[in-house]
Curated annotation (Swiss-Prot):
It comes from Escherichia coli O6:H1 (strain CFT073 / ATCC 700928 / UPEC). The lineage of its organism: Bacteria, Pseudomonadati, Pseudomonadota, Gammaproteobacteria, Enterobacterales. This is Carbamoyl phosphate synthase small chain. Its EC number is 6.3.5.5. HAMAP family: CPSase_S_chain (MF_01209). The keyword Amino-acid biosynthesis applies.
Amino acid sequence: MIKSALLVLEDGTQFHGRAIGATGSAVGEVVFNTSMTGYQEILTDPSYSRQIVTLTYPHIGNVGTNDADEESSQVHAQGLVIRDLPLIASNFRNTEDLSSYLKRHNIVAIADIDTRKLTRLLREKGAQNGCIIAGDNPDAALALEKARAFPGLNGMDLAKEVTTAEPYSWTQGSWTLTGGLPEAKKEDELPYHVVAYDFGAKRNILRMLVDRGCRLTIVPAQTSAEDVLKMNPDGIFLSNGPGDPAPCDYAITAIQKFLETDIPVFGICLGHQLLALASGAKTVKMKFGHHGGNHPVKDVEKNVVMITAQNHGFAVDEATLPANLRVTHKSLFDGTLQGIHRTDKPAFSFQGHPEASPGPHDAAPLFDHFIALIEQYRKTAK
C-alpha cells in the first residue's frame, strides 16, 4: 500500500509525494547533495546528523544497498528526499532494496517530488529547516510547526553525540573489486601508530590511513590531550563530523596542547575547522554549504585543480587566519577556504573529503603528506 508523504520547509513551502521509508516524522536542516552515486555512503555519514538530505540526481536506489558500503554502523541522516525510486535494484552486490533499508533503519523518506525546484529554492534562500511527515493524511500545519521549532545547526555540538563511547583499534584496509573488504592487518604490518579522534569518523577515511601503514586507535571526541599523549602516537588525526565546530571547546583545547608538541596533526572536514579554531581563526555558517562529489578545488601552492567530495555547512573564515596559518587550497565554486597548513608545526587540514566516499580520489595524496610528516617526526623526535 502506497502511503503519502509531505515535506514542509520553515518558509511554508510544501512538497507532496509518497513515503518510501518509515512512517512518522523527521525534522532537520534540509540540504542538497549533487552526487550521482553513493547514496548509502551519504546516508551513513555521521556528518549528516540532524540533516534531511535531498539528492539532486533523479534516480536513487538503482543498485540497492549492502553492508560493505556503510560508512558507519547506522544511518545518521535525519531524512531523505529523492525524485524517483526505481522499481528494481540491480547490482551483483545488492542485498536489500533502498526502501526496505530505510524502513529497517526507521528513516523517514519522501519520493516523487520536484527535487530541482527544491534545490533551486535552497540555493537561492539558503539551507532551511524542514519536516517530513509520512503516513496517512500528513498534517501540513503540524509539519510547519515542527520545522519552525527546530533550532538549527548554529551553536549545535553534535560531535559528542555521534562519537564512539569507548576507544577501539582499527586495522582494516580498503575494499577492492576482486577481494571485497580485506581481513584486519596484523600490527607488525602497520608501522605508524595514529590516534584518531572520532568526531563522526567515516570508515573509508580510517581504511585509507591503514592502507598507508597506520595502526589506528580511535578515541571519543572528548578524550583529553593528556590521555592521547600517554599513548605515544606517531600522529594525530582529526576526523570529519556534524554540527557547528565552535562549541567543541573540549576538542579545541586538546588540539592546542597537541600543537605545543611536534606530533603531526591532520584534520578533515570538522577536523579542519577545529584545527583552524585551535590556531586562532574563526568559522562561519555557510548559506547552503557544500554537498557533492564534483567540487573543483585549487591547490594554490602547486597551481593545480582537483575535483573533490564535499560535505560541510560551516567554513573557516580566511580573513581571520593568524600569521602562522598559510592557505593551501581554495574552492573554485565560491572561493571559500579549503585547506590550511601551520607554518610553525607539522599540522595541516583539508575541508573536503579526500577519502572520496562517494567521489573522486584527486585529493588522496593528502594522506601521503601526513605519512611523510610522521616519518620525519619519527626520525627527529623519537
